[in-house]
Amino acid sequence: MYPQGRHPAPQTPGQPGFKFTVAESCDRIKDEFQFLQAQYHSLKVEYIKLANEKTEMQRHYIMYYEMSYGLNIEMHKQTEIAKRLNAILAQIMPFLSQEHQQQVAQAVERAKQVTMTELNAIIGVRGLPNLPLTQQLQAQHLSHTHGPVALTPPHPSGLQPPGIPPVTGSGSGLLALGALGSQPHLPAKDEKNHHDLEHRESTNNSISPSDSLRTTSEKHRGSSDYSLDSKKRKVEDKDSMSRYDSDGDKSDDLVVDVSNEDPATPRGSPAHSPPENGIDKPRPAKKDTPRRPASVASSGSTPSSKTKPPEHNDKSSTPGLKSKAPTPRNDAPTPGTSTTPGLRPILGKPPMEALAAPALRTPLTCPTPFAMMSHHEMNGSLTNPGVYAGLHISPQMSAAAAAAYGRSPMAGFEPPHMRAPGLPASLTSISGGKPAYSFHVSADGQMQPVPFPPDALIGPGIPRHARQINTLSHGEVVCAVTISNPTRHVYTGGKGCVKIWDISQPGSKSPVSQLDCLNRDNYIRSCKLLPDGRTLIVGGEASTLTIWDLASQTPRIKAELTSSAPACYALAISPDAKVCFSCCSDGNIAVWDLHNQTLVRQFQGHTDGASCIDISHDGTKLWTGGLDNTVRSWDLREGRQLQQHDFASQIFSLGYCPTGEWLAVGMESSNVEVLHHTKPDKYQLHLHESCVLSLKFAYCGKWFVSTGKDNLLNAWSTPYGASIFQSKESSSVLSCDISADDKYIVTGSGDKKATVYEVIY
């Protein structure tokens, strides 16, 4: 069928050679593959080794970071003690005779002259007087680990060795680091385990990264103390969490407040703050900062604590409100929380109980100078909550850092990825190493720390501090407070009622009257007295405003004003008491004629709930802040919007200075910004560590107060924000008011009470 030529041709002499070439090529490819595989294996081993070394370096970094915190806390504490002792000496010296005064003065001056040699002798650095400070520290640290003293070569001028913070001033804080490193009593068991660890690491290059994540103290434990099994480590993490309790209920117990250790200072009374744009002593830690790295893993990974988006939430006692990120769930009971079901959702500001509950943050949301950090998840390798699971620092390391988690007193200790977003490293501290908390922001966005004048905290009308004189147990989360004029009665708004307290009677523990308004399960968000003190207007999570007649023998409802919005977040009264302005959850500003009890106008502009409001002293201009990240001003004579200021954060509170010019704005981002009503310049203040929930100017206009979810009450000078005093309460501070004579401050908080402070001048 097919031609003969189609049959297979006879083999040619070259064909066997072709077969040999294919086999040889296959062998060659196989050899090359094996070579590449060996090379790959070698590189993989090297990679794992480098990963282990990196993890080890990060672990050491965390240890040094904790030590730095503790030592700086101790340094500032000792500095404050020295200042107080100097003040006592200065007060006592005039009682001495002239001759003794001179002798004592000379002795005091001699005591202040501490040389480097004496410091080295005190902390046990002998024989190394001429070495640079960082090399002395390394020498001491290596000496107690029984390793050779391998000093690093000097670094180029102006540069610091990695992992060692820059030394500012006399460096006394880091000199103490050497004292810690030179402790001679390393336990024998630790020494043995240390050498065992070195042997294991040198003989096993492919040790898994998870093993190397164990910290020094974990490796020093006996083999019965832990297992490599990940399930058991999760159990240990859970135990660690139970030791530290939840962020919700017991985190206040973990606050380290060295400023209140003086027994002469009453609980709750604020410590005096220096006029510098920085601190002389640490301020109280907030509850949503990590207590210590040991609790990093057990804190859990939670989203940044923004408020809920609008949704049906049958488990919250207050309706869910719109924001940009979900509120993390907190299973632990918190002050002021309730599980009343069946409440309808309302758009707008965060729920009161969400604000009252302690904030939950991502682990390692670093405690920083005056909350200049991002309150969201940080960038960088340290944010993974699983990286340092079960991280425990050895007793030698953690002893000095027990009180470490207040605000960082020295900004130089923060790595670049842990600084405030948008805040250059050069701005986080000023001369002397003190962290700046007040910044001037120019029209082009340039930020500079504010140099406070010498009389920043001195002068008529500037208070020295405030002391707590009364606690009013309301029984529910206090979302609104106001003080009568003259100062006699305090009005506290909670869930479904306003209670009236007579603070002119010392020790009064019960209200003189209770005004039931709105629905029983709805929170009062604002209550305002008319200037005559005879009428109270109440607004909250309902569509009606209630007008109370207080002049009658028994307070009674005089009228109700109904709007189309489901909630009112804030109220303002015109100086002539003829008009009431209400911030509505739909973003509108309702204008009410109080005489005719009618709605006369609505200002429309906010695209989300209007959260806060204030009116100028002459009654011609209105300022409003909203959850749409804007602050707007309105001309009340012409009924139009004048200005709009855009921010990167939701606006929770604002106040307009009674003397004009300045507007202070409290934000969800924890900043307070002070704006000029005509100039583009502004001041940015960084003492709060969570959202700023309320703000109020003193009637003299020289100072104002702000309160926050971080439990803090801060008093600031106008306009540049020198810190006058600070008080820490036991829960989120949701509302505040100042009496007309500027002598009293009242705050409402999430632990179901209001606190009355007397302002001391």
Curated annotation (Swiss-Prot):
Residue ranges under compositional bias (Low complexity)?
A: 173-182, 293-307
MF terms per GO, please? transcription corepressor activity
Give the GO biological process terms. Answer: negative regulation of canonical Wnt signaling pathway; regulation of retinoic acid biosynthetic process; sclerotome development
Chain segments carrying region Q domain: 1-140
Region annotated CcN domain, chain positions: 205-274
Give the record's family classification.
Answer: Belongs to the WD repeat Groucho/TLE family.
What name does the UniProt record give this protein?
Transducin-like enhancer protein 3-A
